[in-house]
Amino acid sequence: MTTGKSPADNSYLDTLDQIIKDTIAPAAEDIDQTGAFPRAAIDALGQAGLLGLISAREVGGLGEGHRTATLVVERIASTCASTAMVVCMHYAATAVIEAHGPNAAREAIARGEHLTTLAFSETGSRSHFWAPIGTAKSVDGGVQIDAQKSWITSAGQADSYIWSSRAQATDGQITLWLMPADARGLRIPQPFNGLGLRGNFSSPVTAEGVIIASDSLLGADGGGFDIMMGVVLPYFQLMSAGFCVGTMNAATNKTAQHVTRTKLEHMSQSLADLPTVRAYLSRMRIKTDMARALLLDGLDALEQGREDAMLRILEVKAAAGEAATEVTDLAMRVCGGAAFRKDVGVERHFRDARAATVMAPTTDVLYDFIGKALCGIPLF
């Protein structure tokens, strides 16, 4: 992705590219086949300081923000979507810890020794992550947490979860907690075995009488919604769009390679010599670049404090998610029967792209939010 702006020190991109070449790319197909967690990639990113990409310099991090996090996720997604989603969730959760978490956790993340993730969606409220059913109540020894989380990326692999619950003191409000992943009473009912993103370990997690320290509170009791909207949402929306752009770009490039190299020997032509094939490929490129252009404008809007910044934040994931579905559909169509073979490579991107429209906030929810914003109706 052309970032639109160049960080003062972008040597981390060279480091990232080397990790992608040496560690992420060689493991991508195996992760998809077996559903293994990309532990080697996460360890390599941690050792290189990239898990601390958005951690403040004062705690040893790189001190970067939305733009660079989005770029990193996009680059990884073009090679391994599972690894990219793990990193996306880590950065979104890290943003909360940076804003409201303890220095010990911040420093561990900056050192590359701590992987974190979000734990918002629940069985009882599905993709309406702003309406947790799970509870928190003060007890002897701390706070008791009970909940049924429907999806947590890196479940059982992360070191901590940014965990949402109903507020203790105020009905209808949300509270966030820094939940140790090894807390007694946390249980993963079933392992993840999905259509796409097969190595991201997005499993349900149940909390039954989990006791955590009272100082695990992130922000104020009842202040979770504002943190979700003000801290998490911009990071998650932008990085999710970057994830989609990376996936689309990979699918488009692989499709172009396939049609260029594949011959119709009886006609002494390649598939690329067919106007219909070129037209479909052009649509793929245009859709990818349109999503990228909106993403870059969203980043600009946020950084410049424009009035339309929140509208753009809502738009980027909706647009990129729909585009990713369309572009990877076209990749399968253009590559024909060969697309169903693993060696062409586009079917993996086709499966991985399906997640973008259903991850909360889903595309349909975003369409509703955008429509409300345009009509001057409160979102909630």
Predicted segments with their positions:
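Alpha-helical transition-metal enzyme core signature, strongest for iron centers
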Residues: 245-248, 252, 284-291, 317-327, ...
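C-terminal helix-coil-helix/basic helical segment that borders enzyme active sites and/or dimer interfaces
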Residues: 25-33, 288-319, 332-340
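Glycine-rich phosphate/cofactor-binding loops in nucleotide/flavin-utilizing enzymes
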Residues: 335-380
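Glycine-rich beta->alpha junctions and the first turn(s) of the following alpha-helix
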Residues: 194-287
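Alpha-helical scaffold segments that form or flank carboxylate-/histidine-based iron centers
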Residues: 233-237, 272-281, 309-319, 347, ...
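Glycine-rich phosphate/pyrophosphate-binding beta-alpha loops
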Residues: 150-155, 233-239, 356-359
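A short core secondary-structure module
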Residues: 148-187
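Glycine-rich flavin
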Residues: 36-47, 51-153
